[in-house]
Amino acid sequence: MDLSAFPYLQGNYAPVDEERDLAEEELRVEGEIPKNLVGAFMRDGANVAFQPNHYVYPLDGDGMVHAVYFKDGHVCYKNRWVETSHLKTERKFGRTIYGSVGKLLEVPQEVIDAGGEPNPVRNTANTNVIYHGGKLLA
């Protein structure tokens, strides 16, 4: 992706382009992790999956959950895309199709005919993570 025209997608805000599972040996840990610290810290945020086709606001982008897991004095990291119908449709077509709240784009008829998401308002699922009914939701 060429993101040079998008200042909100530079540096620390640049998108992560792959899902990763990192063991403790692959992470930089400073100090010691308490053995009784058990659980996970999760963060959901905007992460564009395809080359933007319009101005990008800092909160535009598909959801990606980053998680750090703690157990028995050890730590690991995982990140995963939030599998929305909009992201699945764009993956199927291999390109950006939908706009954003600030710039709605008409969904191409070919996308609708192929069973893609017809709603032009992208569900980014990039704001929060909640555990409900035995499932992790974004």
Residue ranges and their predicted role:
Residues 1-138:
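Beta-propeller domains
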